[in-house]
Amino acid sequence: ILYSHDDMYFLPKWDYFLINKVKQINSKKFYFSSIMINGDPNLKGHLNLFAGDTLENFDEKKLLENYQNLEHDDFQGSTWAPHLIHKELWNKVGGFSEEFSPGAGSDPDLNMKLWNEGVRIFQCLSKSRVYHFGSVTIRKKNKNFFKKNQGSLANKIFLLKWGMSIKTFKKFYLRSHFIHNNPL
């Protein structure tokens, strides 16, 4: 199952790198993600190259000429979309949990369900790339509701459900934000 946001532009060979990695590991217990190139300079933690933030100002030529020049390592601990997981695993854990809708906290929650099923590969493949326009759908929604859900509400739901914060799970279990490729 490949999960993606509705505001992503998939760059050449994005799928090749994901499929190749799946073939290499010979396991159904994985979570592979592509790295996002952000069109919104306020988003941190990804690659940055402004090629537009709407369909109207999208500079496809600029993006295609420059995306391969951006450097980043592969790393473990990813919770980013787009991500690829085996269909059997997706069905076993029930996919995304509805209590996190419209999305805030849903990725770490899915990762926790996968962790509890024994998944220890949560790898972002830096050569598999997408351009992210910056939460276009969410920008159209009630900003006060999303801001509340994005932060404290999502963290509270996660804490009550799993007995730890999203930050604790990402830091001590997934070891997110560190460049490493060893099993967790």
In which residue ranges do the predicted regions lie?
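Catalytic core of nucleotide-sugar-dependent glycosyltransferases
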Residues: K141-K171
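Short, flexible, basic/aromatic active-site loop/helix in glycosyltransferases
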Residues: A51-Q76, W80
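Short beta-strand-to-loop element that shapes/binds the nucleotide-sugar donor at the catalytic cleft/hinge
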Residues: F30-F50
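Short beta-strand-to-loop acidic/aromatic patch adjacent to the donor-nucleotide binding site
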Residues: I1-Y9
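Active-site donor/metal-binding and catalytic loop motifs
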Residues: I37-G39, S101, Q123-F145
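Conserved donor-nucleotide/metal-binding helix-loop-beta segment in metal-dependent transferases, i.e.
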Residues: K13-Y31
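A short, conserved alpha-helix in the catalytic core of glycosyltransferases
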Residues: F17-L18, Q76-G94, E99-S128
